[in-house]
């Protein structure tokens, strides 16, 4: 969230005061404020849900919702908070984000309480994640508990001809390869997120690349 007294406009558009985040953090890039508690996430949801056009749309049409990155943390993944700076353990933040999403987004997903009405308390600690499985998932218990506090990926069937599959691209995501030291060997920063096909195949396969014998080093160009 940007505050109009700090950033009056962005892309020639007026910044409105949708709310002030209590006990939040500030991005290492620009003057973005982001929530770290359930009260902070509630401020964000209340702010954007005050939009009369969105209210009218919600009243008229059904929505099928799944979260993206900003429902938790801009550059975050699993229960790791990252917003223009170094990654930090954020298991309590992930649970808070999941709780607020559950409270404000219409979706039939099961919370820790086992109910569709209340989220339920879930105690976790912000602990560094030091061990990972072969797919890049941190196996630290608080990380797994935070991630699984709310599972939003699901499938819906409409009639005989439509199966709608909603995927979660962030809760189980591995490390961003563009953050790695020496990444310039396989990555051109002037083309953000663009890898050569050979590098992309190797990155997707991970430890299983080349029959389980990936090269010690990849080069680009």
Question: Where on the chain are the PLM-derived regions?
Answer:
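Metal-dependent phosphoester/phosphodiester hydrolase catalytic core
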Residues: 1-221
């Amino acid at each position: 969230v940007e505050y109009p007294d700090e950033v009056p406009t962005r892309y020639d558009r007026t910044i409105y005061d949708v709310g002030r985040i209590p006990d939040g953090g500030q991005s290492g890039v620009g003057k973005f404020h982001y929530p770290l508690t359930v009260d902070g996430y509630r401020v964000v949801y209340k702010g954007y849900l005050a939009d009369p056009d969105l209210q009218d749309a919600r009243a008229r049409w059904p929505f099928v919702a799944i979260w993206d990155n900003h429902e938790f943390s801009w550059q975050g993944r699993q229960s790791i908070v990252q917003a223009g700076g170094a990654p930090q353990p954020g298991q309590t933040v992930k649970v808070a984000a999941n709780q607020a999403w559950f409270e404000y987004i219409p979706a039939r997903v099961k919370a820790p309480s086992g109910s569709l009405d209340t989220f339920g308390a879930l105690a976790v600690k912000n602990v560094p994640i030091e061990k990972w499985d072969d797919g890049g998932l941190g196996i630290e218990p608080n990380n797994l508990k935070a991630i699984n506090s709310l599972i939003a990926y699901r499938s819906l069937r409409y009639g005989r001809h439509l199966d709608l599959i909603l995927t979660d691209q962030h809760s189980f995501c591995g490390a961003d390869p563009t953050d790695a030291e020496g990444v310039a060997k396989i990555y051109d920063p002037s083309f953000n997120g663009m890898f050569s096909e050979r590098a992309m195949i190797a990155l997707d396969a991970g430890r299983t690349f080349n029959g389980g014998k990936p090269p010690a080093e990849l080069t680009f160009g």
